[in-house]
Curated annotation (Swiss-Prot):
InterPro entries xrefs: Anth_synth/Amidotransfase (IPR050472), CarbamoylP_synth_ssu (IPR006274), CarbamoylP_synth_ssu_N (IPR002474), CarbP_synth_ssu_N_sf (IPR036480), Class_I_gatase-like (IPR029062), CPSase_GATase1 (IPR035686), GATASE (IPR017926)
PROSITE patterns xref list: GATASE_TYPE_1 (PS51273)
Keywords: Amino-acid biosynthesis, Arginine biosynthesis, ATP-binding, Glutamine amidotransferase, Ligase, Nucleotide-binding, Pyrimidine biosynthesis
Active site annotation, chain numbering: C269 (nucleophile), H353, E355
Name of this chain's protein: Carbamoyl phosphate synthase small chain
UniProt catalytic activity: hydrogencarbonate + L-glutamine + 2 ATP + H2O = carbamoyl phosphate + L-glutamate + 2 ADP + phosphate + 2 H(+)
One GO term (biological process): L-arginine biosynthetic process
EC number: 6.3.5.5
GO cellular component: carbamoyl-phosphate synthase complex; cytoplasm
CDD domains to which the protein is assigned, alphabetical: GATase1_CPSase
Organism: Salmonella typhimurium (strain LT2 / SGSC1412 / ATCC 700720)
Pathway: Amino-acid biosynthesis; L-arginine biosynthesis; carbamoyl phosphate from bicarbonate: step 1/1; Pyrimidine metabolism; UMP biosynthesis via de novo pathway; (S)-dihydroorotate from bicarbonate: step 1/3
Domain Glutamine amidotransferase type-1 intervals: 193-380
Length: 382
């Protein structure tokens, strides 16, 4: 039996539709993502913790779901909003249709609403808190109360909530059309030891590091600098993650200690913001953030434009940059800061997602730059 669903924003705007996931309610910050494909990667990206994701492309679910496309061990998005769910999922990799996948993971989702209207509203007013209720008779008053009660992401430290509980090793490379996901590589074949902080790390980031010869020790978000330095890493990676970077004082303190050494540092997304904060810069909450796979970014060093994947609601304030941070990348949508590099240390970061998943790979050479810094560090240490 088809069940009703209702999305209510904190300003009182209502969207009536059809439930395509679990029965119940979901509360979070409502954002929109412009990616045409990759809905499963988006749902399982830890950076979407406490967020309800609106997908602007009208047809979502065409290719179903499969195990290989998951970016983490669970769905982290609080809820899903789409225009149309196809009747049939058709793809040679499909193992489960999207609706069944959402129900199995207990994710509340709504379809058959005007996502263009919702996106325009979020773009004009900014990201809003919202509530989806799915069931026989969704209560609009209750949904509004829940939406207004949600505290928002400002000041919310979510990295320590989504991080791994235990340190683990990662040596698996990237998926290929010919072979699918490969077996884990032997550590003897991976010359560079990189410690990766898991603030909400996506698996494809880890795979792309392995592709470049890194054997990874993935550590919890609150791991101290002293513990990491005892591991004798050739490089330290700061992952993506959800929430506000400013409350992550444990990470900022650790990064400041790493910056007293010459060990190469590479940060992505939240890791980028944390490197900036540890260097003395400030971060700000954006109006509606960047979420999608079609964002143009200018590489200031090479004077070229890259199309990138983005997923963030906070940004580094360029006006707050200290003298030892130089700008390497800027958004061509709104001019916000996208990349920084320390002038006195082998440390750099990027706001977007060079690993894509989903999205283009124009920014993938940033991983190669990290390897170059690691090789230089190892040479100087001899």
């Amino acid at each position: 039996m088809i069940k009703s669903a209702l999305l209510v924003l904190e300003d009182g705007t209502q969207f009536h539709g059809r439930a395509i996931g679990a029965t119940g309610s979901a509360v979070g910050e409502v954002v929109f993502n412009t990616s045409m494909t990759g809905y499963q990667e988006i749902l399982t990206d830890p950076s979407y913790s406490r967020q309800i994701v609106t997908l602007t492309y009208p047809h979502i679910g065409n290719v179903g779901t499969n195990k290989a496309d998951e970016e983490s061990s669970q769905v982290h998005a609080q809820g899903l909003v789409i225009r149309d769910l196809p009747l049939i999922a058709s793809n040679f990799r499909n193992t489960e249709d999207l609706s069944s996948y959402l129900k199995r993971h207990n994710i509340v989702a709504i379809a058959d609403i005007d996502t263009r209207k919702l996106t325009r509203l979020l773009r004009e007013k900014g990201a809003q808190n919202g509530c989806i209720i799915a069931g026989d008779s969704p209560d609009a008053k209750l949904a509004l109360e829940k939406a207004k009660a949600f505290p928002g992401l400002n000041g919310m430290d979510l990295a320590k909530e989504v991080t791994t509980a235990e340190t683990y090793r990662w040596t698996q490379g990237s998926w290929t059309l010919k072979d699918g996901l490969p077996e884990a590589k032997s550590e003897d074949d991976l010359p560079f030891h990189v410690v990766a902080y898991d603030f909400g790390a996506k698996r494809n980031i880890l795979r792309m590091l392995v592709d470049r010869g890194c054997r990874l020790t993935v550590v919890p978000a609150q791991t101290s600098a002293e513990e990491v330095l005892k591991m004798n890493p050739d490089g330290i990676f700061l992952s993506n993650g959800p929430g506000d970077p400013a409350p992550c004082d444990y990470a900022i303190t650790a990064i400041q200690k790493f910056l007293e050494t010459d060990i190469p540092l590479f940060g992505i997304c939240l890791g980028h913001q944390l490197l900036a904060l540890a260097s003395g810069a400030k971060t700000v909450k954006m109006k509606f953030g960047h979420h999608g796979g079609n964002h143009p970014v200018k590489d200031m060093d090479r004077n070229v434009v890259m199309i990138t994947a983005q997923n963030h609601g906070f940004a580094v304030d360029e006006d707050s940059l200290p003298a030892n941070l130089r700008v390497t990348h800027k958004s061509l949508f709104d001019g916000t800061l996208q990349g920084i590099h320390r002038t006195d240390k082998p440390a750099f970061s990027f706001q977007g997602h060079p690993e894509a998943s989903p999205g283009p790979h124009d920014a993938a050479p940033l991983f190669d730059h990290f390897i170059e810094l690691i090789e230089q560090y190892r040479q100087s240490a001899k």
